[in-house]
A protein has these predicted regions:
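Active-site-proximal, substrate-binding regions of enzyme catalytic domains
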Residues: 51-77
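Conserved glycosyltransferase catalytic-site signature
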Residues: 11, 83, 102-103
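Short, well-structured N-terminal submotif of metal-dependent ribonuclease cores
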Residues: 1-42, 57-67, 140
């Protein structure tokens, strides 16, 4: 990995980093976000999932949601899901055992040329297309 490497974060990593639901995972996720900084990539799907879950679980006010969205777009690269990503996600579902939503995340990470996808939901250590390694940052 180089200083120019990019990393994809799934919504579960953000949810731990932004909530106090699990102190150990929150610490791990927060450290990961801090360490990776502006090299972080994620999709509008992740923004949506994070916002809806924080709104539901943490009762965030709409003003706080707007500030969070602004922060995401200001500090990180938020990737739009395009037709090519949807097609790639379909192919991933056909050839691997990805769920619909996980296939979109994986296809988006591949499209953004990320080297690592951090997610709690997918198979830790799996390398996709010899390009993208999936890592569960909470696995000990």
């Amino acid at each position: 990995m180089t200083d120019e490497s990019s990393f994809f974060l799934d919504s579960n990593v953000w949810l731990y980093a932004l909530s106090n639901e699990d102190a150990e995972k929150a610490e791990t996720a927060s450290a990961l976000v801090k360490d990776l900084g502006e090299r972080i990539r994620f999709t509008t799907q992740v923004v949506n999932e994070v916002c809806v879950n924080l709104k539901r679980k943490s009762s965030l006010e709409e003003g706080e949601i707007r500030r969070l969205i602004d922060s995401f777009y200001l500090n990180y690269t938020v990737v739009e899901i395009k037709e090519s990503v949807l097609i790639s996600a379909s192919e991933l579902r056909e050839h691997h055992s990805f769920s619909f939503w996980d296939s979109l995340i994986a296809a988006s990470a591949l499209s953004a040329n990320a080297e690592i996808l951090y997610s709690e939901d997918m198979q830790d250590g799996f390398v996709l297309d010899n390009k993208l390694k999936i890592i569960n940052p909470f696995k000990i």
